[in-house]
Amino acid sequence: MKIKSVELVKTIYKSNDKYPESLNGEFVFVGRSNVGKSTLLNILTGRNIAKTSKKPGKTASINFYKINNSFYFVDLPGYGYAKVSVEERARWRKIIENYFSKRAWNIKLVFVLIDGRHELQKNDEILLEWLKELELDFAIVMTKMDKLKNSERAKMIRYYKDLYGENYTIIPYSAITREGIDKIYELIEIFGGV
């Protein structure tokens, strides 16, 4: 897959903000704060479209990136730990819930980024169960895999495959080595990203 053009077309800050026109589907990137969503988007597009930070909570809005004038990459705010106010976290939750309820019909695939160094966190489990209830297809992207020794890596991949691998794709991924990028592109193509 070749990404020729990328354009930030809409940023959603409030649940009553208007969504952009629909295109040929949306590929959603969601995960805990500081799990690597913005870095992954930058790698996939070959551009620095998403701001990155060592501090959790940099993405505070829903960002719609038009890809090849055909479909969207949708970058959601992180959930879980972030040094932001309770009110700000509540706002993020509201816009995320609103997004999924209003745009589920146009979502092709949700990439759920999970820190592959750790077992499933409660917030991740809640999100995955919610996506199943909404009958949305998702793939689990295990981030930061380069930080694990081979034995730990094999153990964590087995752990996630035992939990979700029968029905969902598990992708070990590293921003450093670029492991998993080809699989993500492949899924985008399979699910209709042209």
Curated annotation (Swiss-Prot):
Pfam families: MMR_HSR1 (PF01926)
Function, in words: Necessary for normal cell division and for the maintenance of normal septation.
Residues bound to GTP: 31-38, 57-61, 75-78, 143-146, 173-175
Domain EngB-type G: 23-194
Keywords from the UniProt entry: Cell cycle, Cell division, GTP-binding, Magnesium, Metal-binding, Nucleotide-binding, Septation
Protein family (similarity comment): Belongs to the TRAFAC class TrmE-Era-EngA-EngB-Septin-like GTPase superfamily. EngB GTPase family.
Protein name: Probable GTP-binding protein EngB
HAMAP family: GTPase_EngB
Organism: Thermosipho africanus (strain TCF52B)
CDD domains: YihA_EngB
